[in-house]
Amino acid sequence: MNYPLTLEMDLENLEDLFWELDRLDNYNDTSLVENHLCPATEGPLMASFKAVFVPVAYSLIFLLGVIGNVLVLVILERHRQTRSSTETFLFHLAVADLLLVFILPFAVAEGSVGWVLGTFLCKTVIALHKVNFYCSSLLLACIAVDRYLAIVHAVHAYRHRRLLSIHITCGTIWLVGFLLALPEILFAKVSQGHHNNSLPRCTFSQENQAETHAWFTSRFLYHVAGFLLPMLVMGWCYVGVVHRLRQAQRRPQRQKAVRVAILVTSIFFLCWSPYHIVIFLDTLARLKAVDNTCKLNGSLPVAITMCEFLGLAHCCLNPMLYTFAGVKFRSDLSRLLTKLGCTGPASLCQLFPSWRRSSLSESENATSLTTF
């Protein structure tokens, strides 16, 4: 008796069908791995984490990020005429962080009720997320190059010409960040999951082969242009800077001035490298370059959510770093808070009484807001 399809062909067709559904639904409920169905990837623990911890944590990051980065912008703007090149880059970095924290309320709302704000706002939020991530990494790379040229090669220029080149560089960075994020902006759309209880999501559309290729292109740009190349540039520059500063021990002030840039870069690496590792692993799984086991398929969504939270927390860490590390910045922050009425014994100004002592003793020799 002849059958039109063999059992082996049926299994292969069934596997292809489930793999396609799994790709389109972004690991939502079930997937076929190694010829058997995996259980649901989002258990009660993950559901509780998304429902309780994520809104609270993102709200805290939002508040700290807005307050901290606004204070950084106000202080740096007050010294606009005397800002160094590094501080100009840090000003734009604070702008990028501030814009990035504005997407957090949208992320919390999407996790609770799905995306209900339409395609235009979907593309806008994706643009804010990706553009500002690219700009943050590129600005940190520019800070590293700027310190490398100034310290290792002693490159100096007339102030007005140097500031003009810095502003042109910052404008170029924002343009490059937008161009790198363009694939995600163009293909972002609101899509409904394939399951009855799925919420609408703002995602990268992968409904055809061209969109899938664009998705892999955006992932490649995200890994290489957004993280790997900037980190290589930063590492190369700061190795040269540290080597040079060890030879020039008679300039301790210059050694202190470069520490904040290295610390900012280190915090960026520590916050974003775990996310890039799990996203890269997710990319390999989708390319079938690694065995897509049920364990991996169930662990990736949890790891991505946790590591993304760590990366977004970076938005509120830089202002804290400037406050605890920068002598002159700390002094200016103390004066600003005093003008705002921060004078009582229980005020924020009294939480760290050593601030004023260290600021008075060291700020006279500080020529930069980011000097230690």
Curated annotation (Swiss-Prot):
It comes from the Eukaryota. Keywords: B-cell activation, Cell membrane, Disulfide bond, G-protein coupled receptor, Glycoprotein, Membrane, Receptor, Transducer, Transmembrane, Transmembrane helix. Disulfide bonds join 122-202. One of its GO terms (biological process) is cell chemotaxis. Residues 77-88, 146-167, 241-259, 326-372 are cytoplasmic. The keyword Magnesium does not apply. It is a multi-pass membrane protein. Expression in mature B-cells and Burkitt lymphoma cells. Residues 1-55, 110-124, 189-219, 281-304 are extracellular. It is found in: Cell membrane. PANTHER family: C-X-C CHEMOKINE RECEPTOR TYPE 5, CELL ADHESION MOLECULE. This is C-X-C chemokine receptor type 5. It comes from Homo sapiens. The lineage of its organism: Eukaryota, Metazoa, Chordata, Craniata, Vertebrata. The gene is CXCR5.
